[in-house]
Amino acid sequence: FVLETLKNLALQQQNYTVLLPLSYGDKAFADKIVESAYTTLSCDIKTLRNFIPLGDYQQILSEVKIAIFGMKRQEAAGNIFQLLNMGAKVFLRKENTLLHWLRKRDFMVYSLEDDIEELAQLTGLTDKQIAHNRSCYTKTFNNTVYKEMMDKLLYNE
């Protein structure tokens, strides 16, 4: 779904690189994704097939301007949260519960199906939008929130 969506965008003309982080999950499926990407897209493709040191991975994520996740279920939440905090424009499938969870907390996230015009522009977030998402991140992920969650979990309060 994502590769077909990307095929219609002007990735090559704008010198974009598609990053495929495939270091976990089914290796045979990852092979199919890589093969399909090379036959479908006409731009640079970078694959991550092995785990790398966390600092190196975070450096790669910090360079991502647009992140597209095509899964229908809640997966890759840690990557999505980090990308939002690092300033990436994130697109999720509209049936992905994480899209709704993030929007409920006022994050600026986009639906892959409903916001296709936004995706087609191939622009990242503005500085104001990045600051907004970082503020949402700080409100959502902090020690006070973690303590409250643990108290509810452990003490059913």
Q: What is the predicted function of each stretch?
A:
Residues 59-75:
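Acidic donor-binding loop of glycosyltransferase active sites
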Residues 1-10:
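A conserved mid-protein helix/loop that constitutes part of the nucleotide-sugar donor-binding site
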Residues 48-60, 96:
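Conserved active-site histidine-acidic residue motif and adjacent donor-binding/catalytic loop
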Residues 32-51:
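Nucleotide-activated donor-binding/catalytic signature segment of Leloir-type glycosyltransferases, i.e.
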Residues 58, 78-86, 99:
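Short alpha-helical segment that forms part of, or immediately flanks, the ligand-binding pocket
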Residues 89-92:
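Short hydrophobic beta-strand element within catalytic cores of glycosyltransferases
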Residues 119-157:
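A charged, aromatic-enriched C-terminal amphipathic alpha-helix characteristic of glycosyltransferases
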